[in-house]
């Protein structure tokens, strides 16, 4: 529990908006205030721990951070309000800070998990809101990221110009 408490308190002190830090040294220095995958993963972490410990006080402790983080993710990081947050995710590819499938998937799972937390804590309105968004996001992931031509999911949604820019940057870095 101490690692979760530390992660939560450092994130709050560093960001103050629900964003979860990405990289912290053993001396407490924050090297990366957070990409966009850590925040939804934190919500899912809290739900998974609760599934093991059944401690409602544990949920109550971190629920405000989860709500704040989901708000940050779905407002500040989703300017076009399509439920796909924009920014760097788990795939740390230089210049790839667009709508990415890993972040969309983590966000969908976090919405499901945060809805379950809200239900346990009897926050019905928030639970229903998160459930509705999770259902829409699941459908959008399966339609907008799916590439019929490649019979596979795309890594990110972007324009041809964005994709070419990534390739050009990769070639320059390889030199």
Label each region the model flagged.
Residues 1-80, 84, 100-108, 114:
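Aromatic-rich carbohydrate-recognition surfaces in CAZymes
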Residues 20, 78-87, 95-102, 106-175:
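Catalytic cores of carbohydrate-active enzymes
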Residues 24, 88-91:
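Residues at the C-termini of beta-strands that transition into short coil/loop
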Residues 63, 91-94:
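Asp-box/WD-like beta-propeller blade repeats and closely related beta-sheet repeat scaffolds
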């Amino acid at each position: 529990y101490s690692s979760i408490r530390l992660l939560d308190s450092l994130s709050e002190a560093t960001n103050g908006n629900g964003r979860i830090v990405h990289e912290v040294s053993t001396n407490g220095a924050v090297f990366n205030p957070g990409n966009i995958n850590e925040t939804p993963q934190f919500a899912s972490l809290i739900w998974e721990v609760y599934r093991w410990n059944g401690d409602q006080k544990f949920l109550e402790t971190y629920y405000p951070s989860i709500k704040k983080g989901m708000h940050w993710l779905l407002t500040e990081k989703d300017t076009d309000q399509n439920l796909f947050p924009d920014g760097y995710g788990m795939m740390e590819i230089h210049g790839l800070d667009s709508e990415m499938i890993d972040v969309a998937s983590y966000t969908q799972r976090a919405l499901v998990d945060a809805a379950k937390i809200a239900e346990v804590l009897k926050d019905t309105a928030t639970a229903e809101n998160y459930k509705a968004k999770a259902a829409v996001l699941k459908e959008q992931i399966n339609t907008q990221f799916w590439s019929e031509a490649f019979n596979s999911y795309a890594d990110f949604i972007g324009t041809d110009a964005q994709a070419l820019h990534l390739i050009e940057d990769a070639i320059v870095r390889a030199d």
